[in-house]
């Protein structure tokens, strides 16, 4: 009876916990140790944002060369603001603010 109670409690706790971002931190600034120098830190945006999938609207589906039933949409952790800096003769963008927005590497 005690073991059953413990198992039920664990199952209930697991069900109510937010498992959407396990293993991935929120989108935020993090110091880049490779390019940072003492007194001159360089930051970059890292972390996770949402993605979702939904049924493709009929109007959109008709316009597709290869119709797909499911459409997915994702956002990535990208720099909202940044300033150009030079570190060891390498031009970099030091991120100053992050947000979840269009994934640039998905654009063609």
From Swiss-Prot:
Name by which UniProt lists this protein: Glycoprotein hormones alpha chain 1
Keyword Methyltransferase among UniProt keywords: no
InterPro entries: Cystine-knot_cytokine, Glyco_hormone
Main location: secreted
UniProt subcellular location: Secreted
Signal peptide segment: 1-13
SUPFAM superfamilies: Cystine-knot cytokines
An example Gene Ontology molecular-function term: follicle-stimulating hormone activity
This protein's UniProt keywords: Disulfide bond, Glycoprotein, Hormone, Secreted, Signal
Residues with glycosylation annotation: 69, 94
Family matches, as PANTHER family: GLYCOPROTEIN HORMONE ALPHA CHAIN, GLYCOPROTEIN HORMONES ALPHA CHAIN
One GO term describing the cellular component: extracellular space
Native source organism of the sequence: Oncorhynchus keta
Example GO BP: positive regulation of steroid biosynthetic process
Cystine residue pairs: 24-48, 27-77, 45-98, 49-100, 76-103
Function, as annotated: Involved in gametogenesis and steroidogenesis.
Subunit structure: Heterodimer of an alpha and a beta chain.
Family to which this protein belongs: Belongs to the glycoprotein hormones subunit alpha family.
